[in-house]
Amino acid sequence: MGKHTSEHKNHAQIVQLLQDGQYFFHKGLKAYKERNLKRASKLIQRAVHLEPEDSEMLSQLAVIYSEMGQYQESNDLLDYIMANLEAEMPECHYFKANNFAHLGLFQEAYKEAAAYSDADPDGEFAEENDSLLDLLDLGDDGIEDSLYDQDELLVKQDRAKSLLESGQLAEAVAALEEITTEYPELWSAYNNLALAYFYSGNVVKAKQTAYEVLSHNEGNLHALCNLLVFYYYEREDEKVAELSDQLSNVYPMLLEQRYKLGATLALVGRYEIGYKWLKSLYKTGFEGDDTFFYWLSCSAYFTGHTDFAETIWRKVESQYPGEDRPAPWIERREALPSSVEQRLAAYYISSTKGETEHLEAVIRSKRITAPFETHFVKLLLNGDSAAADVSEDALFAYQTVKLLEQAEKEEMKTEVMSCWVFHVIQQIRAAAPLKNEKGWAAAICYIWKEAHGKQDTKKDTAARFGISPATLTKYMKYIDDILE
């Protein structure tokens, strides 16, 4: 009996130890000293999850983020510490100064270094901070130029965000590419660029951009969440399972990161974890948009919190009247989304059958996350009258398909041809200028008919599309190159 009691007591002590944030914190420090930064960050994230108001743990995590190249995430944590836990923690200013310097934001770096010097002139990092101030002191003209550059960056970021949200995707891509060229370690701009590529239907470049972020900034939560969304919509199920398992063990402190993680996991069907993070935000009074409440309601329903889910959805309907869309759990009972090409083909075939109600429901649905697809469906519904309100990519796809429809009306109604056509269009959008729809359409038509034993002469095909045989040959070569 005594032995059993002793064993039970020891077991309880072990459990208590494992639940103690200090346990994970010291394990994390050990990993940090061994320069295993990835393991250190994960362990200290666990510690912070258990003891979220421990400023020492949070500041150590911020230092690790900085050494991993996650400068913006590090600064976000340091801001959180000073705003919510310890307003008088001078070293936060020094750490922020270094992060800003790495990001190329030298005026902000100078301000933070000066703040550290004022708050703790003889502090632990005084010597290093003085060296940083000397390095950053470019004189009045230099500081003025730096300030102008940073103001210009903020304007550029705001403009790019506005373009992205309004569906002006070609312009958003151009703006974000310019920002990433000028600020090669501003990972938030890369993440937005990846989304802009994805929304445009350029999934290849979207993935490449996310991979680029992660190659330099391993553990970047926004990049990982973006990548999970890309895998999900491309039906790469094994990668979805692997990455969602990885993200299920992440413990974000910041509200924005909780929102991103919760909504992403809910999207891919990891409702339990998604609900945990979204509900934690709701409890804090987080002022989310309709998308936040959509995924909160959805994840609540599929984790058995049906009354709460229905309450939240009624709130969405009252705050956003006129949307006329089904509750998320009704939409989510439908089959998982197919590839982009299959979805585009399905929309097109629906339009040839006059299924306008179905296409209008698609527009209202949250199932589409890419403005490119929404714009394409709008064109199918409204024709060229919608051209002024859609992206260049969507208009190119629509006009190319309509040219093919005029030439091969019955064939285009078949799923086999339409899926192949949209596959080629997707590759064109990823790798070629969106010009001369007649040239592209003629080449697509000729290659398709040749592959199916229905070959016309190049002269006849070119004449049907109003181009020269030489132009047809040129665009056939383009397609051969991009499909290799």
Curated annotation (Swiss-Prot):
The keyword DNA repair does not apply. InterPro entries: TPR-like_helical_dom_sf (IPR011990), TPR_rpt (IPR019734). It comes from the Bacteria. TPR repeats lie at residues 21-54, 55-88, 187-220. The keyword Repeat applies. SUPFAM superfamilies: TPR-like. Keywords: Repeat, TPR repeat. This is TPR repeat-containing protein YvcD.
